[in-house]
Amino acid sequence: MTLTTQFYTMLAMSGMGLWLGASLDTYRLFVIRAKTARWLLFIHDILFWIMQGLLFFYVLLHVNEGEFRIYIFLAVLLGVATYQSLCKRIYIKILKFVIYLVVSVYQFFKKLIQHVLFRPIVWTCGAIIWLAAFLFKKTYSLIGFLLLCLYKIVMVLCFPIRFIAKQCLKLLPVKMRLTFRRYFEKGAGFLKKKKKLLITIRTTITRFLKR
């Protein structure tokens, strides 16, 4: 190994020492050890050191073809010590500012999307539902009114027929009148049941529309 290669190796490993110090502070800032489960923290630590080891070996492979020397560890310690004494405070301040800036930008765009996209969609859907319920209620009321008018018209038109039918029934024998009365009572009971069902459905729909 030539002196030039050794010099580049020392320089690269010192830089990697600076990188290691900054990486440790970044890792500690993002991973809150007191609030993280032990098994998850163990996995994080293992992955962190594996990534650091692979990165160190990659740099060393490009600088001196992956040869290990004692001075390499000394250069790494020198880089870490330099970071701790000169760069740590500045780096942490810059890192916290960048995190604050990223979070602020994220919150801004989140609120912007909520106000510009989501709320108008919610308001539009609410207006459509209200309009559909209003139209359904008015249509239901109109149909009920028309059916009531039709019922009254039919009753008025059928009044002569009913009157004639009653008079004809009076002329029939008693047994036949009783038979007709039973059939009429059964029909009236059936109609009452259907009427109660229609009233129940109408009440349910009216309560739903009033909400």
Curated annotation (Swiss-Prot):
The chain crosses the membrane at residues 7-27, 40-60, 66-86, 90-110, 116-136, 141-161. Keywords: Membrane, Sporulation, Transmembrane, Transmembrane helix. It holds the Pfam family Spore_YabQ. Induction: Expression is sigma E-dependent and negatively regulated by spo0A. Its main location: membrane. The lineage of its organism: Bacteria, Bacillati, Bacillota, Bacilli, Bacillales. Required for sporulation. Plays an important role in cortex and coat formation. One of its GO terms (biological process) is sporulation resulting in formation of a cellular spore. The keyword Cytoplasm does not apply. It is a multi-pass membrane protein. It comes from Bacillus subtilis (strain 168). It is found in: Forespore outer membrane. NCBIfam families: spore_yabQ (TIGR02893). The keyword Transmembrane helix applies. It comes from the Bacteria. This is Spore protein YabQ. GO terms for cellular component: endospore-forming forespore; membrane.
